[in-house]
Amino acid sequence: MVTIRLARGGSKKRPFYHLTVTNSRNARDGRFVERVGFFNPIAAGAEVKLSVNQERVTYWLSQGAQPSERVAQLLKEAAKAAA
């Protein structure tokens, strides 16, 4: 099954996540099909906290991709910010 989930990056104690489209059997930070955005939970000041390519996310959802619980929350937050 294809999922949209977070892949962790960054360094120790400073997380940074990429929103990735991947096969659910792949490792969390392993091979992915496409990166569709990022999430920086510790963004400060003028740094961007959340960036999502809505066109690609909509495409993958229409193809049957299932977002993880956290990604679903982030997509809702991004849609609210865009409106």
From Swiss-Prot:
Highest taxon of the lineage: Bacteria
InterPro entries, alphabetized: Ribosomal_bS16 (IPR000307), Ribosomal_bS16_dom_sf (IPR023803)
GO cellular component, one term: cytoplasm
Keyword Ribonucleoprotein: yes
Pfam families: Ribosomal_S16
Record keywords: Ribonucleoprotein, Ribosomal protein
Entry keyword annotation includes Ribosomal protein: yes
GO biological process: translation
GO MF term set: structural constituent of ribosome
Family the UniProt entry places it in: Belongs to the bacterial ribosomal protein bS16 family.
Identification of the protein by name: Small ribosomal subunit protein bS16
Native organism: Pseudomonas putida (strain ATCC 47054 / DSM 6125 / CFBP 8728 / NCIMB 11950 / KT2440)
